[in-house]
Swiss-Prot record:
The keyword Transport does not apply. It is found in: Host nucleus. The keyword Chaperone does not apply. May be involved in DNA replication. Residues 422-437 have a biased composition (Basic residues). It comes from the Viruses. InterPro entries: U79_P34 (IPR004138). GO terms for cellular component: host cell nucleus. Pfam families: U79_P34 (PF03064). Residues 156-241, 417-438 are annotated as: Disordered. This is Protein U79. Keywords: Host nucleus.
Length: 480
């Protein structure tokens, strides 16, 4: 037999906190100490450990005969360390000493606790039984000593292997946990790298908006075309028609309408340059810029078609107007010859300064000024009136008649409203006295008189029962 493990503990300033007798055979004691020291020996090596402030709990059980029992000692320190020792077997108990001797599988374990004069001692010893009693008698034999040492080394090696196996198991579990954490980190890093590569391969947003999908372009084009057609129907534009409606050519442009592509082209070029830079003047997005560019392009195409169709309509209208102009001239000469009595020079009847009223008609980018007063007095508007006109224009009763001619061959008559006081172009500034005779009453009853009434709604191109005199006058002048 030999002492395999030894442990010795000594504690100072020990105070018994309490003692509890749970039953006649079960007791519990608790002690507190200020400092202590514990020394352990294993084979040929030992360790020493000191403590400061802690507690000791001692639980022991005794049988009815007080010959058997068990003892458990727990030591706890304020630093968070703890130790425990236990033994079960023969019991030796006194007032200050409690000792247990346990014999199992060739090993004997002894645990002793003593408390006296403020000190507490703990002794823990394990004794290994190697050989039988007859062999112990021959301790002086060399062979026996070699065998004994060999067995001791085997026991030490076994204990060392057990401890190593225990430590390696803990390390293996620790490495397993570390491997799992490392694997998770690697997967997370790979996912981040993959996501970053996908973002690098993805094209820029600007390139995505530069060329929208074909379906989107077709849809935008059809929507723009449909909106333009609806707007043209609402505005009453019918550029392909050449019929006369209430004396006006349907599809003809108003004198105040001007189509100038120069300014729009400048704006389109500016929009294209700004769109190429990725931003618009109003700060719109690329998608909005593309929509505006398509809309401007559609408007430009519509404008070009409108100008081309308007030119064709005007040419056809002029050809028809020329035929009607010949008819108007014949009626004009006939009416003047019938109504003329006195031949005097033609003069302006206006008392105010002569102001030539000029209006513009624009069919393309070319703009030309036309004096309306040169051709306006020679138009008989009743020739262009249709039979279905229900709102006949009223002719004012107050008229002024001037009949004059230098050669006496042709006379002229005018019925001028009070609102138009300008003199005709090409007349002298002299005044001709008004002559009232019997022809005046006859002139009022004639139906072929040439009437120009600025008070009527002739300037309104959209009125159903009116006709644009300025447009007709300008068209006739261009034809002549």
């Amino acid at each position: 037999m030999y002492a395999e493990e030894r442990g010795y503990g000594s504690f100072d300033n020990v105070i018994q906190a309490y003692e509890q007798i749970i039953s006649q055979s079960l007791h519990l004691k608790r002690f507190e100490f200020d400092n202590g020291c514990f020394i352990e020996f294993l084979a040929d090596s030992g360790t020493c450990e000191t403590f400061s402030k802690g507690w000791i709990s001692m639980i022991y059980w005794t049988s009815e005969t007080d010959s058997m029992g068990s003892l458990t000692v727990d030591i706890g320190m304020d630093e968070g360390k703890c130790r425990t020792y236990r033994a079960r077997g023969l019991l030796l108990c006194s007032k200050s000493i409690t000792s247990i001797s346990q014999n199992t599988e060739g090993r004997e374990r002894i645990l002793t606790v003593s408390h006296e004069n403020g000190k507490l001692q703990i002794t823990f010893v394990t004794i290994a039984k190697v050989s039988s009693e007859p062999e112990l008698r021959n301790l002086g034999d060399l062979k026996f000593m070699e065998k004994f040492e060999k067995e001791c080394r085997a026991l030490d090696r076994k204990k060392h292997d057990d401890e190593h196996r225990k430590r390696s198991g803990k390390q293996k579990e620790k490495r397993k946990v570390e491997d799992i954490d490392k694997k998770k980190e690697d997967e997370k890093r790979k996912q981040e790298e993959k996501k970053r590569n996908d973002e690098d391969k993805r094209p820029d947003k600007k390139d995505e908006f530069d060329e929208p999908p074909k379906e989107k372009r077709q849809k935008s084009h059809h929507e723009t075309k449909r909106n333009l057609e609806e707007q043209s129907h609402e505005d009453g534009i019918a550029p392909t028609s050449t019929t006369f409606v209430n004396g006006a050519v349907e599809g003809a442009l108003s004198p105040c309408v001007s189509i100038d592509n120069h300014e729009d082209q400048q704006h389109d070029e500016l929009d294209k340059r700004v769109y190429a830079q990725g931003t618009n003047r109003e700060g719109l997005s690329n998608e909005d810029n593309y929509g505006n560019f398509q809309l401007n392009k559609s408007l430009e195409q519509l404008r070009a078609r409108l100008v081309a169709s308007s030119g064709e309509v005007v040419e056809r209208s002029l050809s028809k107007l020329k035929e009607r102009l010949d008819y108007v001239k014949d009626n004009l000469i006939k009416n003047v010859l019938e109504c003329a009595d006195v031949t005097v020079p033609s003069k302006c009847l206006s008392k105010t300064k002569h102001i030539e009223q000029k209006k513009q008609i624009v069919f393309s980018d070319c703009v030309r000024s036309v004096p309306v007063c040169e051709i306006k007095p020679f138009i008989d508007m009743r020739v262009f009136e249709t039979e279905t006109t229900q709102n006949a224009r009223r002719v004012r009763q107050r008229t002024r008649t001037t009949v004059g001619s230098t050669d006496g061959a042709i006379g002229q008559q005018r019925v001028i409203s009070g609102q138009n006081r300008g003199r005709a172009r090409g007349r002298g500034r002299g005044r001709v006295p008004r002559r009232r005779n019997s022809n005046l009453n006859n002139l009022r009853t004639q139906n072929s008189a040439i009437v120009i009434d600025d008070s009527s709604e002739t300037e309104n191109f959209e009125n159903a029962g009116s006709f644009n005199e300025d447009l007709l006058a300008t068209t006739i002048l261009e034809t002549l």
